[in-house]
């Protein structure tokens, strides 16, 4: 699968993603590990306020979040989706987790992709599995 099927955009933020080619390769590796391929995956980096409004409009939730994932897939095993990530939340969460912004962002990038492969994070057990999958995904990075 061509790696140009993963796109990065920004809304209401000046954030510039570095190492795009390496990140695309890594995300494709995660998908392949889960026996999925990526047809089209859009990551949209945005502000807290932008994502809060989306959370209100689309999910009827009135709180800040770091990520919202929309699954547009029509065929099992073929990923199509839009993932909105609040750079403000990522930066704050990195501090809270005593992590770097880069590592926290990569965790969130993987988290959204893992949702599109079927992993959930509502229950304690699901959260534990998601965290383990995020950790495994981070260990696949070669950059």
Swiss-Prot record:
EC class of the enzyme, as a word: hydrolase
Alphabetical UniProt keywords: Cytoplasm, Endonuclease, Hydrolase, Metal-binding, Nuclease, Ribosome biogenesis, rRNA processing, Zinc
Transmembrane region(s): none
Name of the molecule in the record: Endoribonuclease YbeY
Cofactor note: Binds 1 zinc ion.
EC id: 3.1.-.-
Subcellular location: Cytoplasm
Superkingdom field: Bacteria
Species this chain originates from: Cytophaga hutchinsonii (strain ATCC 33406 / DSM 1761 / CIP 103989 / NBRC 15051 / NCIMB 9469 / D465)
